[in-house]
Amino acid sequence: YGYGMDGILRSRSDCLCGILNGIDFTANNPETDGFIVKHFSAAHPEGKAENKYALQKRLGLEEREVPLIAMITRLADQKGVDILAPVLDEMMRRDVQFVLLGTGEPSYEYTFRSLQSRYPGRVSANIFFDEALAQQIYASADLFLMPSKFEPCGLGQMFSLRFGTVPIARKTGGLADTI
């Protein structure tokens, strides 16, 4: 770390601070976003539920009032998929729904496709990436998973917070700094 400057940076740590990534609050605004079904805000949150029902319908999920857990990620060990995979069935034993959007290691793609086949109407494994669907997921989910092993900063937690979706993340890197 620090490109050979670790010692100098540590000795000056009292007067240094990191600069976080950021998101465009104009483009990522639940009050104006062109990708979502119904606009909403903290003052008028009822549109979030309408987005959830629309997403459930679009993805073939049962239209129910249960927690909708989402994950938008690259399917790789760094993103904590290897930590999550062994507990997916335990998670699904609860009355929840799960939506995944992302691609990556073929073994993890298979894991999520298999999960979807075991829990029809409750799991939607979308093994691709689509910006419009990502926005709809951020605007619709109740909880957003980010089990990353390391994350220099991360953006998913910022998008989820912007759209009123509670992030659940490992305490690491930028996730610890922004949640």
PLM feature spans:
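Catalytic cores of nucleotide-sugar-dependent glycosyltransferases that transfer UDP/GDP/TDP-activated
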Residues: 1-179
